[in-house]
Design a protein with these regions (language model features):
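Generic intrinsically disordered, low-complexity segments enriched for polar/acidic and small residues
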Residues: 71, 85-86, 99, 151, ...
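Short, flexible loop segments at the rims of nucleotide/cofactor-binding pockets, characterized by
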Residues: 21-23, 100-102, 176
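Substrate-binding cleft/loops of secretory-pathway carbohydrate-active enzymes
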Residues: 53-66, 79-117, 132-136, 190-192, ...
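Short, low-complexity, polar/charged sequence segments that are solvent-exposed and flexible
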Residues: 24-25, 63-67, 93-96, 141-146
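Active-site mouth of glycoside hydrolases
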Residues: 1-86, 117
């Protein structure tokens, strides 16, 4: 099954700069714990994604959450900084090296044991964040603010260079390559007895 990590809606570079915003996050944290706290898969709680700034503020939130509801594990932020209050750490990298492999180079070196051997469980962040060529047939499925303008840019570039007829081949080839990479990276983490697992980017409700 899947375990859920809930996050505060915090993805900022100046944590702690605005007291009113900090108060909002604390209220939101309590609201999340109150509303979803009994969900059996809700085992991890994090203050937000790739935050930067005053981590004392984030540690304070972690300690308050732990005191309020100790049924799950808490972490200050995904990526960027590992804090003393972290009961687990989700990141691309630890103090011992990279745990999320982004490079597409051919390789047989998938051992991430050393990199995940720190003082708390380590979960690899964004292992599925891989690029592939777009499917231009999907453009017509979206309207309004969701129209994929970036797809239109790539389609125009292909047409300008006389390669538009290859678009479907590019889509299929890069999709297969992405699938192979995703499989190898996640299997490497599953085979690593020191790994705490890997984090999927999102789970639609």
């Amino acid at each position: 099954g899947l375990y859920l990590q809930a996050e505060l809606p915090m993805w900022i570079k100046d944590v702690g700069q605005y007291p009113a915003r900090r108060d909002y996050f604390e209220k939101e944290m309590y609201a999340i714990l109150e509303e979803y706290g009994n969900h059996p898969s809700f085992i991890l709680m994090c203050n937000g994604n790739e935050n930067e700034g005053n981590f004392d503020v984030l540690e304070d939130l972690v300690k308050k959450a732990q005191k309020y509801d100790d049924r799950r594990l808490y972490s200050a932020s995904t990526a960027r900084t590992h804090t003393a209050s972290d009961q687990y750490y989700t990141s691309h990298v630890t103090s011992k090296g990279w745990i999320t492999v982004y490079e597409g180079r051919p390789s047989t070196d998938w051992d991430r044991s050393k990199e995940t051997e720190i003082d708390c469980p380590v979960i690899a962040h964004e292992t599925g964040q891989r690029c592939m060529f777009p499917n231009f047939d999907e453009i017509k499925k979206y309207t309004g603010v969701l129209v994929p303008r970036n797809f239109e840019v790539f389609r125009e570039r292909l047409a300008r260079n006389g390669m538009l007829h290859q678009a479907d081949d590019f889509f299929k080839a890069t999709g297969m390559h992405t699938e192979l990479q995703y499989k190898e990276v996640n299997e490497a983490l599953l085979l690593n007895r020191k790994s705490g697992g890997f984090l999927l980017l999102g789970l639609p409700a």
